[in-house]
């Protein structure tokens, strides 16, 4: 008895699953088997074999009649008599008859005196052909199942009424289900599982067909290499080859199509080729490609993917509802949920649209030649064509614009034309051109580049945040991080500004016609016009109009206008022009290190009398020249004693030199300060701009000489000397004549 002792319980389980034998008294008409706890009771075993010799049928009662259980009972008696299994005392209750030599699974319901016994597998007709001489290792179960198999038919498994009834010499077939593989006779290597699967097949050779499911492949006659899984899957195929279909009614209309793959309920449900055709269609997902009739070379993966396509060719759709409205469009690629969701060409059209991402190109109707990659990329486009879009929500507002390139999150996200327009905008980078609405022919490369532009035209910007504040400016070129970053025209304006270099022209707001080339070139100018700065830090202060600075740091402190600084460091402290700040209308050539200036021809200096006024005879001549003190000397410039990093702030008046930086070459000239004394003595240089030959730089730190101005003075001196000589000659002649 089952109790608390583990070993006893395990022993009871083992005995219950064991094989028991019980002998019937010779020629007995009745027999009782009792299921009890005794270890020697065979009736407690699941498998019972009755033995003994009988001369008539014997009724066996299994007690008690209140116990519900299942037994596998074998009639192992001799004498060819039946045994009849009962449980209740009511002779009218159902019993099970087991012929001599047979085994049956019987169920006892334990209902007391009226208990019934059922044949658990009553519908099965079991025959073991291995006991006959027909074929080798065949198994058949069912009415007429495999009943035609001959000695040449081997290794067949046939289960089900009328299954494989025509098989004679076919090998290696599996037919399970009513009328499964019913017609095939002499060929093998087929698997048919399900009601009437492969029912009509009668191939001319090894078919290698696999059909699993209600009426799967039921119409196939001589089609080969098909794999069909699911109720009514491929149930119309007759001669089609190499098809794979899985799911209810998948590929259920086609008759002669080959090389199709349909996985999912109703996938490729309507495909039907009336002539032998290699469709090369692949549909995976519920209703995917369900409307395809004669379209070929389509790949449709996802629920409802391409489910409206009828005769379109060469399409690829991956994702739920991808390309789900188009009927006749061709050569489209839609990857992502709802990608190309509404595209619909009613006539055969090579769309060449590619959309990859959630709802990418979801609203395209008839636009063509679009490439859209990224979630919601180009998702409002309807008829626009030849757009290239990569990035989340890039070009996500436009519906009819064409020829746009938007690469990066939100690139050209606001562009939207009311009428068909070739925008020819290119925006590459995070938020590049994100605010452009109707601007055209802009090229914007870099994160946040031109991200405030709305209606601007013909702008080129490249580099992080270049041209990032302007809304309506036109014809600007900004190349470099932060170039023209603050330019902003609130009305349509052709700026014609060009800035190349990191933060070149960074502070320009409304200035126009400026050219800045070099990192930080012109980076503080805001409203200057016609400024040209070429070189690192050239004209890097907020300068007025018309300045030109060419060279590293050329004129970097200038705020005045119409100056020209040519050469590295020109117009800075220590250069010939000094540190130019508020200067105007000046030219500075080179820096303090220049030793020679070479030119092929003479300078031509403007001197048209029509452009002059207030003429007065020069009164400085021979006496002035005679007072000059010419010298030979070597340069020992104060700026040489200052480090590069201090030159912008040093006061040259505080510098003394000790000869350690003097040049080794000889020069000739005057001391400007001595000449200035002579000029003042002659009545000049009393007020600003009344000097003759000396000049103090704008910062007041360096004197210079304008040697070309000595020409009129020397001419005057020669004239005075000539007059004196003439007078002297006249006196000499008078004396000689006296």
For each feature predicted by the language model, list its residue ranges.
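C-terminal intramolecular chaperone/auto-processing assembly modules
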Residues: 124, 681, 686-738
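Extracellular receptor-binding modules and their adjoining Ser/Thr/Gly/Asp/Asn-rich linkers
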Residues: 8-13, 17, 21-24, 102-117, ...
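Glycine- and small/polar-enriched repetitive beta-structure motifs of secreted/surface proteins
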Residues: 125-607
